[in-house]
Design a protein with these regions (language model features):
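N-terminal secretory signal peptides that target proteins for export/translocation
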Residues: 1-16
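N-terminal extracellular ligand-recognition/capping segment immediately after the signal peptide
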Residues: 43-46, 64-102, 139, 143
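Short glycine/acidic-rich loop motifs that flank beta-strands on beta-rich extracellular proteins
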Residues: 77-79, 92, 97-103, 142-148, ...
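Parallel beta-helix/beta-solenoid
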Residues: 87-89, 108-166, 182
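Right-handed parallel beta-helix/beta-solenoid
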Residues: 31-57
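All-beta strand scaffolds that present successive hydrophobic residues in beta-strands
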Residues: 69, 87-91, 114, 129-135, ...
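Bacterial N-terminal signal peptides
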Residues: 20-29
């Protein structure tokens, strides 16, 4: 009898544990959302031929809240501007496409005196919501518009966003019209052009200070990442190009030719065949990292196939554990790892590899100071010899 009671107690405890796990899982199973509004609840109205008006209604409904944007194709024929501190949580396959010419498809610029140290509500309370963000989505300028501009916030998060085919720029972080922004935290941003006719544009343009960018990829914007302002920190940012084909070729034709060249030995004959097709459109005049302003730090960043890997113009900058490479199959036969045009530059524990036999390691002019520490260089037009010379003269002022 005693054993039977004990067994009953054990069964009861097991059932109670199972019930607890079921209750804990219910919110997840129900697809609970933290959003204050969902774009799906704001359909197009009669006479509307694109999705911009419904976006505006949804944004208005989520002031200082979160707007959820589900998967879908969204035609945007006029600019979207967020001024009410509405954060955007977008499905990775939420594809916002510009269908008419405009400056930016999406601008996030909260209303308020962000130039001052502290922001106040109308009733005098301090406004200190530092959790504002844009996450997810594919913002496609479609060659008609720049993709995204961020302005006017104290601490802001940008994550898991794709920026396609920005006409002038993929992402611009700026003061805008009398605005101010610092402490942008950007992670897993993917900026890429996959259409022709956009040469001369910029993937990411940081015109403010105190921002942190991590795990950023920029592909086939003529200037990959431009950094101005001061004290910005970039970690594991990779800029490369060559997917947009040379003039006279289609994307599929160029992609197939490149794939075939990878599957066979790289011989002088194969090289001549690739070079005969011309230079991929976005590589002419390309700069992976355009460094301006003051006190910027680049850690583990990779300049991969550009005419200029790191262009440093004024101020002070640090390159630490960064890399440079020129892919010979892309056709660049003029490439320099570092072009130094002003200020002090510390290069430490970096690796430079010239793949096409033509690359230069370092070129300087103007008022510059180079500090060269424990770097590796090989290939190119004798980059190893250049590195030895730089090491001997480390700390010199040109």
């Amino acid at each position: 009898m005693t054993e039977s009671i004990e067994m009953t107690r054990c069964r009861t405890l097991r059932r109670m544990r199972s019930l607890c796990w079921v209750l804990l899982a219910l919110p997840l199973a129900a697809g609970a959302s933290l959003a204050d509004a969902n774009l799906a609840d704001f359909p197009r109205r009669a006479g509307e031929t694109d999705d911009a008006p419904r976006f505006r209604r949804a944004i208005d409904a989520a002031a200082n809240g979160i707007l959820e944007v589900p998967r879908g194709e969204y035609a945007i024929a006029s600019p979207l501007v967020v001024t009410n501190r509405c954060s955007l949580e977008m499905h990775p396959a939420a594809h916002l496409v510009a269908t008419r010419e405009m400056d930016f498809l999406l601008t996030w610029a909260a209303a308020g005196d962000y130039v001052s140290l502290t922001l106040f509500e109308s009733d005098g309370r301090i406004y200190d919501n530092l959790g504002l963000f844009v996450r997810g989505g594919d913002i496609d300028g479609n060659g008609l518009a720049s993709c995204l501009r961020l302005s006017n916030a104290h601490h802001f998060t940008l994550a898991n966003v794709t920026l396609h085919n920005g006409r002038r720029v993929g992402l611009e972080v700026s003061r805008g019209e009398k605005g101010y922004l610092y402490e942008l935290v950007a992670n897993n941003v993917y900026a890429k052009c996959n259409m022709k006719g956009l040469a001369g544009n910029v993937g990411i343009d940081i015109g403010v200070s105190d921002c942190h960018l991590t795990d950023i990829f920029v592909i086939d914007y003529t200037v990959g990442i431009r950094v101005r302002g001061s004290s910005n920190r970039l970690t594991r940012c990779h800029v490369w190009g060559g997917t947009v084909p040379p003039k006279g070729m289609g994307v599929r034709e160029w992609s197939t030719l490149y794939g075939e060249s990878k599957r066979r030995p790289w011989t002088p004959e194969a090289e001549r065949e690739m070079l005969a097709k011309g230079l991929p459109e976005m590589l002419a005049g390309s700069v992976a990292f355009d460094i301006r302003g003051w006190e910027h730090t680049f850690d583990g960043c990779y300049a991969d196939t550009a005419e200029t890997g790191f262009r440093v113009a004024g101020g002070n900058a640090i390159l630490s554990r960064c890399g440079f490479y020129n892919n010979p199959r892309m056709g660049l036969r003029k490439s320099t790892a570092i072009v130094h045009r002003g200020g002090r530059l510390l290069v430490d524990s970096c690796c430079f590899n010239g793949g096409a036999g033509c690359e230069r390691l370092y070129e300087a002019s103007g008022d510059t100071t180079l500090l060269w520490r424990t770097n590796i260089a090989q290939g190119g037009a004798d980059m190893a010899a250049e590195a030895r010379k730089l090491a001997e003269n480390a700390g010199r002022r040109d």
